[in-house]
Amino acid sequence: MARIASVNIPDSKRLVVSLTYIYGLGPTMAAEICNKAKISKDKKVKELTDQELISLRNIIESEYKVEGDLRREVTLNIKKKKDIRCYQGLRHIRKLPVRGQNTHSNARTRKGKAIAIAGKKKTVK
């Protein structure tokens, strides 16, 4: 397995697909990186030469925020919003959907498991 941006990428897959295993690189960015490195997108990772791997590493490390740096930036942005107590920050604090989604009947993933409410006590007539 080749190692790029401290991630082991699979050898048997095409280069474009393998690059998407790196956090922060989707299919579009992976194709863009292949074009910059002048490497065919359909080439398998195990067919790459050492020089091609080095050029891929250099392009990714110099031009893109990936893996730890990107995760750190995202968490710092969320923390900053929480600190200034803007609307999105408050939604993060309350563990509710941030981007305007409805919460009346949905948002179970974000809110957590449903909490049962005790039923009304039946009175004997």
UniProtKB/Swiss-Prot annotation:
| Recorded GO MF terms | rRNA binding; structural constituent of ribosome; tRNA binding
Q: Name one GO cellular component term.
A: small ribosomal subunit
What processes in GO biological process is this protein linked to?
translation
Q: Is Transmembrane given among the entry's keywords?
A: no
Q: Which Pfam families match?
A: Ribosomal_S13
The highest taxon in the source lineage is: Bacteria
This protein's UniProt keywords: Ribonucleoprotein, Ribosomal protein, RNA-binding, rRNA-binding, tRNA-binding
Summarize subunit and interaction data from the UniProt record for this chain. Part of the 30S ribosomal subunit. Forms a loose heterodimer with protein S19. Forms two bridges to the 50S subunit in the 70S ribosome.
What does it do?
Located at the top of the head of the 30S subunit, it contacts several helices of the 16S rRNA. In the 70S ribosome it contacts the 23S rRNA (bridge B1a) and protein L5 of the 50S subunit (bridge B1b), connecting the 2 subunits; these bridges are implicated in subunit movement. Contacts the tRNAs in the A and P-sites.
UniProt lists the family membership as follows: Belongs to the universal ribosomal protein uS13 family.
UniProt xrefs under NCBIfam families: uS13_bact (TIGR03631)
Output this protein's name: Small ribosomal subunit protein uS13
